Swiss-Prot record:
Its main location: nucleus. Keywords: Chromosome, DNA-binding, Nucleus, Telomere. The lineage of its organism: Eukaryota, Fungi, Dikarya, Ascomycota, Taphrinomycotina. Gene3D superfamilies: Nucleic acid-binding proteins. This is Protection of telomeres protein 1. It holds the Pfam family POT1PC. Self-associates. Interacts with ccq1, poz1 and tpz1. GO terms for cellular component: chromosome, telomeric repeat region; cytosol; nuclear telomere cap complex; nucleus; shelterin complex; telomere cap complex.
Amino acid sequence: MGEDVIDSLQLNELLNAGEYKIGELTFQSIRSSQELQKKNTIVNLFGIVKDFTPSRQSLHGTKDWVTTVYLWDPTCDTSSIGLQIHLFSKQGNDLPVIKQVGQPLLLHQITLRSYRDRTQGLSKDQFRYALWPDFSSNSKDTLCPQPMPRLMKTGDKEEQFALLLNKIWDEQTNKHKNGELLSTSSARQNQTGLSYPSVSFSLLSQITPHQRCSFYAQVIKTWYSDKNFTLYVTDYTENELFFPMSPYTSSSRWRGPFGRFSIRCILWDEHDFYCRNYIKEGDYVVMKNVRTKIDHLGYLECILHGDSAKRYNMSIEKVDSEEPELNEIKSRKRLYVQNCQNGIEAVIEKLSQSQQSENPFIAHELKQTSVNEITAHVINEPASLKLTTISTILHAPLQNLLKPRKHRLRVQVVDFWPKSLTQFAVLSQPPSSYVWMFALLVRDVSNVTLPVIFFDSDAAELINSSKIQPCNLADHPQMTLQLKERLFLIWGNLEERIQHHISKGESPTLAAEDVETPWFDIYVKEYIPVIGNTKDHQSLTFLQKRWRGFGTKIV
């Protein structure tokens, strides 16, 4: 960077080169940092703070102090949240004191590493920094007094660069504040000058699982968590894979449409950041190259993960309500409203009937215990089965169950049958000896329960003890006690809790409401018992399905 004053265009040329110099230091642009193939590279960075968390002390490990910043520069899309960087220090008083988003920040000696398929930055022990105020602010009070140990000495070149970065940042944010929306009738072009080809758009009624699709839609409902942003969108076309919204199942905030017209979209990373700041209910959006999949309840949903390398050119953008591409959506919306006014009672009656025929084994939601770790007291053999959810199993088509299916679930035990351990072994047929036979009601993170049967050799494999054998347990209290101690490893004090509720004349299912039993992986075989020569697939019903445990051992 020379002595002459440069403008925004020249700054963009410097950044687009990927690597550039200011004074004696060489810097890496944010986008090139995110795309570096060689990880654990030490770089210097210069950008705008797009988000941050104040410094705090870690409660575990070395108990270092840490602050997290998201650094942005013009090589990133406007909607991108930038590069995540964790700054660590043994002392809490020598980390940057950031007051607000928009401040220019220079970081010296940052290590880039790969984490969960994305790049993030970590500070080295000797890292240093320089921080400027938000120059677009009327007051320079946006710069707090900074701690001296890591503060870099900078000159006019660095301040000029910071000023230009802040100017471009201010221009980009003002575009959204003033409602200057991107015209979607032309190809999109980002700040780096890369233009993308036109995209093929679909109606929501045409999308299917496991594809990438693009569509226009109206935002019906939004909410967010610490991790992501969720919205429901519709183009007023119907898809049989969508969740059937009705006045009985949707929240009071749901204003329609009712039926299978709306799809849930979960947004992460830069898409999350963009929607939190610029999208509200009622807005029209264009979503490009989003991924579709079946959720844990068996319904279609859309996912937008971070895509800093632009491999898929995924995006969500607000669209001006006067765009001609929205005319058909508005027309279908008017027709939907008119039809509802003419026959809403019939629609509600139809939907309520469909809700009454829901799967009988899907339980009411209980207060979920967070999964901190999987117990070491359970192993599975073989270890090749793919992890799935109970809801996915319950919503699988019956006609595909001509052969048994095997699943791996991550669950906790919330109930069992019989209620007395003395009945866990029964006489075999013909009555010559005893065999194990009992069932565990398990629940996974989707808050759905499944009854899993353990019989004979599969149950013996679960118990996994030569000292505990099936017998008339009522006549062998010592054997029953050993069985109780063995099962304690997978269900904790659940048996005592259930017996406590039974002794008080209460329902034993109350024990499952705040259960804190261990989490573990269980193998389940799903099948329909063959009775006679049944080949009529149409006669199969959900209540014929069975689930048996296998390949699971307590150790």
